[in-house]
Each structure stands twice: as structure tokens, then as C-alpha cells.
Design a protein with these regions (language model features):
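Nucleotide-activated chemistry modules centered on ATP-dependent adenylation/adenylyltransferase
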Residues: 1-38, 54-216
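Short, glycine-rich nucleotide/cofactor-binding loops
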Residues: 39-48
Length: 216
């Protein structure tokens, strides 16, 4: 199919190798040498983020793990996250979203009938990761997004298109929402510009540098 063809045409441009990862890890360690943490990682309790937590410790980094509780966490999922991070000796910060606001926003997206139903969660996650990075003076955010697992998808169904578009989220909620979003984490265009170009936040898709396979 055309998505598979596009994947194989672009895979060599995106995927890197462990030798290319080494100088990045060295730079993260050097810049964070006088800080408690040298990078931020997002944890959901899923396979990808759990492996990233294991990998960054194996690489000798000192991460602060950030988890977003959007109201859908189960007790088992929370327990798994806490046990995993305790085993790896990684500190955890959990941001709990106002459930009434988030529920109203999710209902707004359902009523809008757009494909990207996870846009509100993805946006909030990225906003919280950058907020925690700013608070701790950390430049590097290491995540579990990866080309191999996520590229073969109809672009029109991908949350990546709108997950950073606060205007889209705000306008959908303005049309369909019933309560104000007073505390919902957000990344305005200014926030994006400030974190990326002034504070130089850098996202490392670390799984693109290694031979990562869920089957293994």
C-alpha cells in the first residue's frame, strides 16, 4: 500500500544507530552534571515508555519521570508505574488533570467528530513535560515515540497533526464545551517558541537510535 511504500522510502532518513546516540548521551550528561536530573522522561505505563525508563538508566542518565493522570488511570496501571520506577531508582512526578475539565474537553472532541481523539491528552502531556523541564532547568526530554511503530498510519488519522495546536483545541472546546478550561495544561504558540528557541528544549526519540522491537 502507499503507506508501506512511504515507510520504506523514508526509513533510512529517520532511523539512526547507537553510535549516533553516544554523543547525544554525553552532551546530556555534561550539561546536567551539576543538577539532580539531566533529562525528563514521560511514563504512561506502556511498553514503549517503560523500556525508555530502563534504557536511560542503562545509558547512565539521571531522569525525572513525569506521568500525566488524565482521569483514566487504573489502580493497576499506577501501581505498575510506581513499582517499575522504584526498581529503576527513578523519581516520579505525577500531574493530575482536573477531571471535570478534561471530561468536558473529551466530550467536545467527540461532538466535533474529528479523528484525533487523543489530541487533548497528547497536548497536555507535552505541556506538562515542558513545564517540569522549565522548573528544573532541564533541556532534554527523552520519549518513546518511534518511527518504526508509528509511521504506517493514515496522516488524517494521526494525532500528531493537531496535538500541538492549542488554537484547535480551544476552538473545538469553545464550540462544544460547557465549562471553562481554567487549569488544563496548554502550549500556546508563544510557549512552543519559548521552550524550543529560547530555552532550547530538545526532544530525543531514543528508540529511533536502537534496534527496538516489541516482539523481542
Amino acid at each position: 500500500c502507499n503507506y508501506c511504500t512511504s515507510y520504506f522510502e523514508n526509513i533510512d532518513k529517520v532511523l539512526k544507530n547507537e553510535e549516533q546516540l553516544k554523543p547525544i548521551i554525553s552532551k546530556i550528561k555534561f550539561e546536567g552534571r551539576n543538577k539532580k536530573y539531566d533529562c525528563i522522561i514521560g511514563v504512561s505505563g506502556g511498553v514503549d515508555s517503560t523500556y525508555v525508563a530502563y534504557l536511560v538508566k542503562k545509558l547512565g542518565l539521571r531522569p525525572l519521570a513525569v506521568h500525566l493522570d488524565n482521569g483514566w488511570d487504573s489502580e493497576l496501571a499506577v501501581s505498575n508505574i510506581e513499582k517499575t520506577l522504584k526498581k529503576l531508582d527513578i523519581d516520579l512526578y505525577t500531574h493530575v488533570i482536573n477531571w471535570n475539565e478534561f471530561k468536558d474537553l473529551q466530550l467536545s472532541f467527540l461532538k466535533a467528530s474529528i479523528p484525533g481523539m487523543e489530541i487533548p491528552s497528547d497536548h497536555a502531556i507535552f505541556a506538562v513535560l515542558n513545564k517540569v523541564a522549565l522548573k528544573n532547568g532541564i533541556r532534554y526530554i527523552v520519549n518513546g515515540s518511534n518511527f518504526k511503530m508509528e509511521y504506517i498510519m493514515d496522516p488524517d488519522w494521526s494525532e500528531f497533526i493537531g496535538q500541538m495546536d492549542w488554537l484547535l483545541i480551544k476552538n473545538i472546546h469553545k464550540q462544544f464545551g460547557k465549562i471553562p478550561l481554567q487549569t488544563f495544561p496548554r502550549m500556546t504558540r508563544w510557549n512552543v517558541y519559548y521552550t524550543k528557541f529560547i530555552k532550547k528544549h530538545t526532544v530525543i526519540n531514543v528508540l529511533d537510535y536502537i534496534d527496538f522491537s516489541k516482539e523481542k
